[in-house]
């Protein structure tokens, strides 16, 4: 019993890793009717930091707003928000779930705030990113990996 490793999950730090706001058509875009087509792309990743039990989890969101004909770009926003988490005594699927779903859920409100602030400072109407179910995205990715492995005759752990 004494040999069992205690499970530890701690948020160490949340930080803005990179951000960019572009308004390539300014000032002419401000004279156009505001009927944007908005495209939101999302990516998240996790990696071990150093030799210890710390992991960096990063969310990258790219938001592009174009006119209806998609000829002119109103704005392009890219935000990379990250956090450092201590994950000790938690392995395998449980750790993968923490890093692939739980941690991104913690970071996403910060991404939403940065995107909203940048768009407002660019003099555009408020952009509020809708909530994202990272648990469902994680499970979908996991199912896809298992399906690909099964097709190749391998097993996924």
From Swiss-Prot:
GO MF annotations in UniProt: unfolded protein binding
Primary subcellular site in the record, as a coarse category: cytoplasm
GO biological process, one term: protein tetramerization
Record's subcellular location: Cytoplasm
One Pfam entry name: SecB
PANTHER family per record: PROTEIN-EXPORT PROTEIN SECB (PTHR36918:SF1), PTHR36918
Function field: One of the proteins required for the normal export of preproteins out of the cell cytoplasm. It is a molecular chaperone that binds to a subset of precursor proteins, maintaining them in a translocation-competent state. It also specifically binds to its receptor SecA.
Protein's recorded name: Protein-export protein SecB
């Amino acid at each position: 019993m004494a040999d069992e490793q205690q499970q530890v999950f701690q948020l160490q730090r949340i930080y803005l890793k990179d951000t960019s706001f572009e308004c390539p058509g300014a000032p002419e875009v401000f004279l156009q009717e505001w009927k944007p087509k908005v495209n939101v792309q999302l990516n998240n990743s996790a990696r071990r930091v150093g030799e210890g039990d710390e992991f960096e989890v990063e969310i990258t969101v790219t938001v592009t707003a174009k006119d209806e004909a998609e000829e002119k770009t109103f704005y392009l926003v890219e935000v990379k928000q990250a956090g450092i988490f201590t994950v000790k005594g938690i392995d395998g699927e449980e750790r993968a779930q923490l890093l692939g779903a739980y941690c991104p859920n913690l970071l996403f409100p910060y991404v939403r705030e940065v995107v909203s602030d940048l768009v407002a400072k660019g003099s555009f109407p408020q952009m509020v990113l809708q909530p994202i179910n990272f648990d469902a995205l994680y499970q979908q990715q996991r199912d896809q990996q298992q399906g690909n492995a099964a097709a190749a005759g391998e097993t996924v752990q």
